[in-house]
């Protein structure tokens, strides 16, 4: 559009110049026509120069696009090669790898974090199994617990046979009477002896020696565990 407009303007100025030349006009009119013609020629020249620059830029763009395509092809080739290297040189599975051994100290530290206690319980001796100063917990109930049970009450109110069982003790319970029995009288006598000797019995009978047990032994202290096969730590020490 701009080229056509510039060319039309130039043709119009030339036709006007021919017409003015045939006519007798003032020279200022001719100079003005020539000035406009020169301006249109400059415009056409600038358009032509711009067109030339555009062609050069287009050629450069074409060359750059060509280089871009070539670089894309090179990148694709490099990616294919990298993929092939990954498939051939790196292991496909991790099952064949050697597993690293864990140190024992690491396992112990981890176990201390998970466990309730980080060390052995107080009073524990690996050689004897229990410290001499620590309280001993036997698998049978203590004397205080036995005094509060029905088994002790039945044993103090009647004299069972050596082969009597717990069910027989419950079934052979005599009827209760308001009069004190012989066993209750013996228990009162036993309490009087304990007050005189001022001895405090511990929670477990194993803490008292045999001599002390002999001093306070009375007819009321019957063998409650008669007929029962229980573990005795004193017999274990003899062996």
Swiss-Prot record:
Residues found modified as Phosphoserine: 204, 218
Region forming the signal peptide: none
Segments for region (Disordered): 168-221
InterPro entries named in the record: Mediator_Med4
GO biological process: positive regulation of transcription initiation by RNA polymerase II; regulation of transcription by RNA polymerase II
One Pfam assignment: Med4
Positions of disulphide bridges: none
Keyword Transcription among record annotations: yes
Principal place of residence: nucleus
GO molecular function, one term: transcription coactivator activity
Subcellular localization, as worded in the UniProt entry: Nucleus
Alphabetical UniProt keywords: Activator, Nucleus, Phosphoprotein, Transcription, Transcription regulation
Biased composition (Basic and acidic residues): 188-198
Function field: Component of the Mediator complex, a coactivator involved in the regulated transcription of nearly all RNA polymerase II-dependent genes. Mediator functions as a bridge to convey information from gene-specific regulatory proteins to the basal RNA polymerase II transcription machinery. Mediator is recruited to promoters by direct interactions with regulatory proteins and serves as a scaffold for the assembly of a functional preinitiation complex with RNA polymerase II and the general transcription factors.
Subunit architecture: Component of the Mediator complex.
PANTHER family the UniProt entry points to: MEDIATOR OF RNA POLYMERASE II TRANSCRIPTION SUBUNIT 4
Family of this protein: Belongs to the Mediator complex subunit 4 family.
UniProt-recorded name of the protein: Mediator of RNA polymerase II transcription subunit 4
Organism: Schizosaccharomyces pombe (strain 972 / ATCC 24843) (Fission yeast)
